[in-house]
């Protein structure tokens, strides 16, 4: 049956920009894909659900209506500057980073903001820092990306990333098990709720200050959008942390951007990264009516 899509929710890293062996040009979305996302966002909401923090995503996804960061820990609803002019109480905080928008740095501002469990976040941020220092000392090949909540600048997660190693698949097989043992020793030595997200095939390990998953995060986006049962959601993702979101979407598409990544995804379809732009262009041209993958890809 044809399905009319009302909302698109997408992961960022590995989905809208390829994981590849090396980091892309500033981890940016390729221009042709970004253009179609802007076109779509003028008609229906496009939302981002990412493990990245808002500091990283802010400039890169200005087409998005909702940006759910650090696996749903921090959620932003964005409004265009025009709607801001018409709505006096839209500002989040006086003197906040929001005011940068007025100087033309962004095409939108934050209109709603939610943060999960600030108590746990504060309690565990010091532990994350200690763990980060420990890994940095023991495994010099790994690059560690700290992720901070945007409003208070509290360390909320760390991402251990070794995709810059040319044959990272060997590192994954031979060295990553030792990295995980080191993390486990640290986590078990202290009372804490740190949450370790591992990946079967990706060159990452993510560690969060609390248990988070994209199933809960997508529910929060549905709630913010006030979705009715009739409104159908398309979800795009590339790794096993997207599986809970794939299961909650009406149509789900897994993206492959590196032949070394063969993770089993719970998505309805799988496409190559270079097929995503033509797929979205066709969906846009057909007024967001999806009718079987083969027809959409022609």
Question: For the regions a protein language model found, what residue spans apply to each?
Answer:
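Mg2+-dependent phosphoryl-transfer enzymes with acidic/Ser/Thr/Gly-rich catalytic loops
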Residues: 3, 208-298
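Conserved acidic, metal-coordinating active-site core of Asp-based
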Residues: 129-234, 240-248
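Asp-based phosphoryl-transfer active-site loop
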Residues: 4-23, 218, 246
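Short His-Asn-centered micro-motif
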Residues: 10, 49-52, 236-238, 255
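Active-site phosphate-binding/coordination module
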Residues: 19, 28-147
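Short, well-ordered alpha-helix to beta-strand connector turns
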Residues: 5, 43-44, 64, 71, ...
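Hydrophobic "anchor" residues on beta-strands that sit immediately upstream
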Residues: 6-9, 66, 233-234
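Glycine-rich phosphate-binding "P-loop"
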Residues: 16-26, 202-209
């Amino acid at each position: 049956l044809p399905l009319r899509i009302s909302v698109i929710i997408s992961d960022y890293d590995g989905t809208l920009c390829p994981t590849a062996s090396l980091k892309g040009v500033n981890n940016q979305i390729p221009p042709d894909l970004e253009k179609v996302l802007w076109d779509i966002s003028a008609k229906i909401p496009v939302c981002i659900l990412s493990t990245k923090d808002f500091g990283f995503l802010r400039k890169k996804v200005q087409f998005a209506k909702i940006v759910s960061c650090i696996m749903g820990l921090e959620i932003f609803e964005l409004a265009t500057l025009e709607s801001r002019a018409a709505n006096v109480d839209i500002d989040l905080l006086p003197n906040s980073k929001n005011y940068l928008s007025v100087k033309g740095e962004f095409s939108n501002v934050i209109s709603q903001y939610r943060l999960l469990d600030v108590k746990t976040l504060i309690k565990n941020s010091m532990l994350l820092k200690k763990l980060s220092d420990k890994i940095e000392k023991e495994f010099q090949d790994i690059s560690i990306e700290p992720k901070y909540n945007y409003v208070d600048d509290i360390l909320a997660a760390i991402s251990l990333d070794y995709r810059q190693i040319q044959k990272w698949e060997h590192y994954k097989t031979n060295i990553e098990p030792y990295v995980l043992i080191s993390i486990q020793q640290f986590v078990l030595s202290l009372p804490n709720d740190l949450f370790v997200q591992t990946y079967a095939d990706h060159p990452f390990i993510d560690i969060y200050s609390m248990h988070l998953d994209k199933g809960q995060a997508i529910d929060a986006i549905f709630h913010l959008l006030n979705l009715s049962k009739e409104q159908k959601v398309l979800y795009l993702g590339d790794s096993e942390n997207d599986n809970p979101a794939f299961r909650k979407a009406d149509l789900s598409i897994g993206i492959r951007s590196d032949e070394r990544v063969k993770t089993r995804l719970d998505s309805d379809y799988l496409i190559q990264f270079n097929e995503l732009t033509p797929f979205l262009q066709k969906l846009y041209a057909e007024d967001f009516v999806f009718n079987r993958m083969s027809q959409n890809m022609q």
